[in-house]
């Protein structure tokens, strides 16, 4: 139905171009989110990752060689839920969408670089409704699906969360 994009945030720089060599970068310390964060840093042009790395890979800061990190950024691994409240401790931090929203951060206004809505992660990490096979044709599920994929739900996500929650369906699908 929707996903919350990762974004790069900072209280110290207003542009990634201002990031100094040796800057400290806060990363989520759990495997799936750290991979996602490192791939976002690559998409932003800050580092490179090993060839063949995908969203399904398990990547950590230890996989990033000096050659892949020519600016000598220091990666600080922290529990994902602590990155937004401690943002001032890092030059930049890659923060999960839900934690950013909880801290009042919005990708479109506060994010220095935001995960693309058509990224591999948008599909892989989309929030969905899972049901038992026996309920697939139930009236309540049809009603729930209609409500969650309605134009009203689409507009609510777009207007309320300002890029912090992205519908995985199009407005045309909702009409």
Enumerate the predicted regions with their spans.
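Short, solvent-exposed mixed-charge patches
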Residues: 173-175
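Ligand-binding "clamshell"
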Residues: 13, 89, 94, 103-116
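Solvent-exposed loop/turn segments at secondary-structure junctions
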Residues: 14-15, 31-34, 81, 98-102, ...
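Short helices/loops that flank or line small-molecule/ion binding pockets
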Residues: 39-40, 61-100
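A bilobed periplasmic-binding-protein/Venus flytrap-type ligand-binding module shared by bacterial periplasmic
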Residues: 4-16, 125-143
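Periplasmic-binding protein-like
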Residues: 35-42, 146-169
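Short mixed-charge
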Residues: 47-69
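A conserved helix-loop-strand patch within extracytoplasmic ligand-binding domains
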Residues: 1-47
């Amino acid at each position: 139905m929707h996903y919350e994009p990762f974004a790069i945030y900072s209280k110290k720089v207003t542009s990634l171009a201002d990031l100094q060599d040796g800057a400290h970068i806060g990363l989520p310390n759990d495997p799936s989110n750290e991979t996602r964060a490192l791939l976002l840093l690559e998409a932003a042009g800050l580092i490179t990752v090993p060839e063949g790395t995908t969203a399904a890979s398990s990547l950590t800061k230890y996989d990033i060689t000096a050659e892949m990190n020519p600016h000598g950024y220091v990666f600080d691994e922290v529990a994902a839920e602590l990155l937004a409240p401690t943002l001032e401790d890092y030059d930049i931090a890659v923060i999960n969408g839900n934690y950013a929203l909880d801290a009042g951060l919005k990708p479109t206004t506060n994010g220095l670089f935001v995960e693309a809505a058509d990224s591999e992660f948008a599909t892989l990490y989309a929030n969905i409704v899972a049901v038992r096979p026996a309920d697939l044709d139930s009236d309540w599920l049809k009603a729930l699906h209609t409500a969650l994929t309605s134009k009203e739900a689409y507009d609510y996500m777009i207007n309320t969360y300002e890029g912090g929650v992205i519908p995985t369906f199009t407005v045309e699908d909702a009409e």
